[in-house]
Amino acid sequence: MFTGIISDIGKLEFNSEDEIHITYSNNHFSNLEEGTSVAVNGCCLTLRNYENNKLVFQVSTETLSKTNINPNNNNYVNLELPATLTTFLSGHIVQGHVDNTALVDRIEQLDNDMWNFYFKGVDTKYIIQKGSITINGISLTVVDPEDDKFHVAIITETYNRTNLQYLKEGDTVNIEYDMIAKYIEKQK
């Protein structure tokens, strides 16, 4: 389980068909054990090993086909360590199970150093106005869901601490819908 509060941004490199290396700069990752879960762009991956500020993960064909963790996408990824019983939950409960990907439709910089990011290609039956959504592992609040689109308002702090700063229109992002919304929809 994760909180959607990003610890660091890493640089993704493909070492082989099923192995990725992520270079990071933050000390949060210096004392990890092999087998630890790490959210990479919101996708829960198991740490194979690490050395010299580099995390190594094995990735399945399923992960490569269902997420934006692939050689054709942006090489900057958001990283988060799993929550513990003492973790301050300042985002929302994130499982690290990517539901689908969406496209960045438009990015709008506002006058007050804030941004609106518009996304399309989502299943809005799991999205409500002011509800939680996870985009590339980031806990965010939905604005104006309609048809297969919605947008989020991004403050400077979130923009600077995440890979949102590297996104451009047409890029693919990972989406995890709110777990409670998925359970409610299943009960219908």
Where are the regions a protein language model picked out?
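Conserved loop->alpha-helix
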Residues: 1-188
